[in-house]
A protein has these predicted regions:
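N-terminal signal peptide
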Residues: 2-32, 450-455, 470-477
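Substrate-binding cleft of secreted/luminal carbohydrate-active enzymes
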Residues: 25-26, 30-44, 71, 76-79, ...
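Alpha-helical scaffolding within the catalytic cores
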Residues: 59-61, 114, 225-237, 268-277, ...
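A solvent-exposed, charged loop/short amphipathic helix patch at secondary-structure junctions
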Residues: 94-99, 142-178
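Aromatic-lined carbohydrate-recognition surfaces of secreted/lumenal glycan-active proteins
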Residues: 172-232, 266, 281-297
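Glycoside hydrolase catalytic-domain groove-lining segments
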Residues: 235, 239-242, 247-297
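Extracellular cysteine-rich, disulfide-stabilized repeat modules
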Residues: 375-376, 386, 419-427
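C-terminal GPI-anchoring signal of eukaryotic secretory precursors
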Residues: 445-462
Length: 477
């Protein structure tokens, strides 16, 4: 064995004896520590306009159409899951009585069971996402347009007991609302987990940390989640303990495009999601799947830049997320032009980056975690990412699909992974081992000299993709 490799092995023996990070569940798709998932009705691009999209680099592909069943990602909107009480924002109509306090949970269970059996006819691994955005289970978080649920709840209490003061009526209404909301949220999860236990059940947008203050002062924006919001997330311990996956959103608005603030925004949201994932059991992390969009949140046709893919996907992968779900609505498919734009974005921008992160995540998992865990950034605020080293690897397109050239991990790759990443193992037993480190490449190219271990800056990952498309070549050169 080369002396340098021997020293590296000894180092890993010393560092890998314990397991500092919590463990988590294995990935939905084996051998893919970080999953890329597509959830949009883009099959319409081919059926309407003859423009198929290249989704071959996504590990799971599904549709959001109401008619689509047996999808690997099943998202349940308010018209697809039992009884969902809410007040229609446009008409003011009370749908299903409007309030969680008024839901017949027996009827809700029966209807939800029918919906689950329709949309998930066979129990197989995948995601099951409950999308209830009309109201929130915590009284204090129903602000703005959602204040209507507090108003109506108070009015109902006063109607039953006119002798109560305003404060007394509100206190009583708060208790009744939160008790019913918690019961509704938990019962819905319980129904899903009982009928389709192989699915990962959770609520879209949970957890959130409401770090939107860049709208007030972009220059001073730190991205930090307000302490009060973290405390409120602590109060949702009952929800985190019942969820088998967490589905936070890291959508970016156009105002954050290509900015350091975008990365801060996402980083703190992901750190909070990971923190919340261990609240119910400090030694176990509930899998986190972050929702992204191919376009900016407040746009229908402006696609995410390469830099913002790093700020969203790159951050999520480095901080220990199990994957990202790229969600799109009908705007992606409503015209031939929109389908063409989506196809061009995938080919020129997104697919090369997906291949980059997928490959680097797998190599790191193999090198550090024996493929029995995913790599997680040691220091959450470091600008290090699960990217291929552009000095060794190339992503190329030569008369066919994108491919990665460069071989397996070198000693420098493994050393760099070890310096910056730990393992989050897929069970309670330690997954870091010295065995795989003997298998790193010991070829003449790397044997003579060791680099400093420093990689080019974050932005230089684009160099790796320069050969993939002429567009990227133009952008970078």
């Amino acid at each position: 064995m080369n002396p340098n490799v021997a020293c590296l092995v000894i180092q890993f023996l010393l560092l890998g004896a314990g397991q500092a990070s919590p463990w988590t569940s294995p990935p939905v798709k084996s051998d893919h520590p970080f999953l890329f998932m597509w959830n949009a009705p883009t099959e319409l691009c081919e059926s309407r306009f003859g423009l198929p999209l290249d989704l071959s680099h996504f590990h799971l592909v599904s549709s959001t159409l109401k008619s689509a069943t047996d999808q690997s990602i099943s998202i349940f909107y308010n018209d697809r899951f039992g009884i969902v009480p809410y007040v229609d924002e446009d008409t003011g109509e009370f749908v299903d009585e409007g309030l969680p306090q008024l839901v017949d949970l027996k009827e809700h269970r029966e209807l939800a069971e029918d919906d689950i059996e329709f949309y998930i006819p066979v129990d197989q691994p995948g995601l099951a996402v409950l999308d209830l955005e009309e109201w929130r289970p915590q009284w204090v978080r129903n602000w703005g347009g959602k204040d209507i649920y507090r108003q109506i709840s108070v009015e109902r209490v006063k109607a039953r007991n006119g002798s109560l003061s305003d404060d007394e009526a509100e206190d009583r209404a708060k208790i009744l609302f939160e008790r019913a909301a918690q019961r509704y949220f938990l019962r819905s999860l319980r129904i899903g987990k009982r009928l389709r236990p192989k699915r990962l059940w959770g609520y879209y947008l949970y957890p959130d940390c409401y770090n939107y203050d860049y709208n007030q002062d972009m220059d001073e924006f730190t991205g930090e989640c307000p302490d009060i919001e973290k405390e409120r997330n602590d109060d949702l311990l009952w929800l985190w303990g019942a969820s088998t996956a967490l589905y936070p959103s890291i959508y970016l608005e156009v105002a954050l495009r290509d900015s350091a603030q975008a990365r801060r925004f996402v980083r703190h949201r992901m750190v909070e999601a990971v923190r919340v994932s261990t609240l119910a059991n400090g030694s176990y992390s509930v899998p986190v799947y972050a929702y992204i969009r191919p376009v900016y949140k407040d746009s229908t046709d402006e696609y995410m830049s390469e830099m913002d893919l790093v700020s969203t996907i790159g951050e999520a992968a480095a901080l220990g997320a199990a994957g990202v779900v790229s969600w799109g609505d009908m705007n992606v498919t409503d015209s031939e032009d929109s389908c063409f734009d989506a196809r061009r974005h995938l080919v020129d921008v997104m697919n090369p980056y997906i291949l980059n992160v997928s490959t680097a995540s797998r190599l790191c998992s193999e090198a550090l975690c024996q493929s029995r865990g995913r790599c997680v950034r040691k220091r959450w605020d470091d600008d290090v990412f699960l990217h291929l080293d552009p000095r060794r690897y190339r992503i190329e397109r030569r008369r066919g699909p994108l491919t990665v050239s460069g071989g397996g991990p070198s000693r420098d790759d493994v050393d760099w992974f070890d310096r910056h990443f730990d393992c989050m193992c897929y069970d309670e037993s330690p997954c870091r081992s010295v065995e795989t480190f003997n298998a790193v490449q010991d070829d003449p190219f790397h044997a003579g000299s060791r680099s400093s271990g420093r990689r080019p800056s974050v932005g230089s990952y684009f160099l790796l993709m320069a050969a993939a498309t002429s567009l990227l070549g133009a952008l970078l050169g």
